[in-house]
UniProtKB/Swiss-Prot annotation, chain B:
Its main location: cytoplasm. This is Phosphoribosylformylglycinamidine synthase subunit PurQ. Pathway: Purine metabolism; IMP biosynthesis via de novo pathway; 5-amino-1-(5-phospho-D-ribosyl)imidazole from N(2)-formyl-N(1)-(5-phospho-D-ribosyl)glycinamide: step 1/2. Its EC number is 6.3.5.3, 3.5.1.2. The keyword Cytoplasm applies. It comes from Nitrobacter winogradskyi (strain ATCC 25391 / DSM 10237 / CIP 104748 / NCIMB 11846 / Nb-255).
Amino acid sequence: MKARVTVTLKAGVLDPQGKAIEGALKSLGVDGIASVRQGKVFDIELDGDKTKAEAALKAAADKLLANTVIENYRVEVLG
Amino acid sequence: MKSAVLVFPGINRERDMARALRLVSGREPAMVWHAETSLPEGTDLVVAPGGFSYGDYLRCGAIAARAPVMDAVRAFASDGGLVLGVCNGFQILCESGLLPGILMRNARLKFICHDVHLRVERSDTPFTRGYNAGQVIRVPVAHGEGNYAADEDTIRRLEGEGRVLYRYCSASGEVGDTHNINGAAQSIAGIVNERGNVLGMMPHPENHVEDIMGCTDGRGLFAGLVAHLERAA
């Protein structure tokens, strides 16, 4: 089974990388960009049933993939 | 002082740290591999050195913080043992929950590698007793992610409880945005835990301990630890 964990910075946390990318896009003339926040995507393959997979992914995100001081995460089982 | 230096894959400042500890304490530190599950008998001080553990993949220090040896370090710290984390070591201590907050990308995005001035905020702790309160010292920094951040309550507590021990400043000791090299909250360069036995700091005192290094301002930190342990013994 394939799954995806998306880790993003919480609202209000300064994201210097996102800001730099935002500036670069503006200087490249890409119009209409209001703001950019950078995050991370983990594509994960798992065995077992969907309920177990969701629990494992949540544990993975809580234990290592995200630092919940500054980051939020979202878990999706893609089937 | 019987010290132990943690060694993680990718770390590259462990020998600088060992050299400084040997020089100031007169004893050879133990080098402890990340896969160990215990610390050497009679360890007085555990040091998480700088370097780039696991290549800084994921988040700086995140993988090292989950290494087997860190359970032993947590137990050592909760028994009151002294723990020092420098640079990547500071990041590891934050990621492992031994210190609050996190080190984020430098606000101006650049990797910073030069000497900085630090104001020693108080001298009545094991990590600062080699200095006077308000003293300005010069030590090098070398980091891309040293921008200390925590929620407002944590920052308020750190300040209120006098847990900021080192702060970026000018040569004459002024603190402000122009001297805050990485954008850290409150110009924080080093903090201790609630109990005062775990210090994390971004600058490298171990690289200013001998005349040949051009400055010996970092020596006071290690000398203070030795003095503290001698008095406790």
